Structures are given as C-alpha cells and as structure tokens.
C-alpha cells in the first residue's frame, strides 16, 4: 500500500469488521 490513509482504512476497517 502506498498511502497510509488507505492502508489504515483497508487494514483497520477490515480487521474491525472481522475481528471487531
């Protein structure tokens, strides 16, 4: 991932949805 913002949402967002 190039952008930190996108990585944050892509990784964090998915983690929250999966792991909560």
Curated annotation (Swiss-Prot):
GO molecular function: any one? cytochrome-c oxidase activity
Quote the cellular component terms of the Gene Ontology held in the record: mitochondrial inner membrane
Biological process according to GO: oxidative phosphorylation
Q: How does it sit in the membrane?
A: Single-pass membrane protein
Instruction: Cite the EC number.
Output: 7.1.1.9
Keywords, comma-separated and alphabetical: Membrane, Mitochondrion, Mitochondrion inner membrane, Translocase
The reaction(s) annotated as catalysed by this protein in its Swiss-Prot or TrEMBL entry are: 4 Fe(II)-[cytochrome c] + O2 + 8 H(+)(in) = 4 Fe(III)-[cytochrome c] + 2 H2O + 4 H(+)(out)
Protein function:
Component of the cytochrome c oxidase, the last enzyme in the mitochondrial electron transport chain which drives oxidative phosphorylation. The respiratory chain contains 3 multisubunit complexes succinate dehydrogenase (complex II, CII), ubiquinol-cytochrome c oxidoreductase (cytochrome b-c1 complex, complex III, CIII) and cytochrome c oxidase (complex IV, CIV), that cooperate to transfer electrons derived from NADH and succinate to molecular oxygen, creating an electrochemical gradient over the inner membrane that drives transmembrane transport and the ATP synthase.
Name the family. Belongs to the cytochrome c oxidase VIIb family.
What name has this protein been given in UniProt?
A: Cytochrome c oxidase subunit 7B-liver, mitochondrial
Source organism of the structure = Thunnus obesus
